[in-house]
């Protein structure tokens, strides 16, 4: 597999494991000294970043993160990438929904186990929040639930 494909698959695994809350596999996306900057929310290690996500995106928080239009540059055993993010967070218990977009800026390092994230983060281009009570007819179904029409 070429480096750009491997880095793309790593980013997709990061997003899938974040949204499915598979925290051990999520942690495997990073080197221990990973740093993060999510629009000013800073992290100085993999453990701090993963712990924060685990505590702040518990079961019942529905998330969708998608990235598009990668700009990946590989230089030996390091790489950089920019990704266009679209995301949504729904918290039925609080009747809350957030939609937004951002640009991720990532750095990667090649390890004996393959490419890993050395730094990740994004800068928001916009964010919209909704009170679900203000959206008539809204029904939110989580994993395993379906609306039958």
Walk through the language-model features, giving the residues of each.
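Short, low-complexity N-terminal intrinsically disordered segments enriched in polar/charged residues
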Residues: 1-32
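Residues at structural and domain junctions
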Residues: 11-12, 35, 58, 94
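A solvent-exposed, acidic/Ser-Thr-rich amphipathic alpha-helical stretch
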Residues: 23-87
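A beta-strand edge to alpha-helix "cap/lid" segment located at domain peripheries
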Residues: 58-149
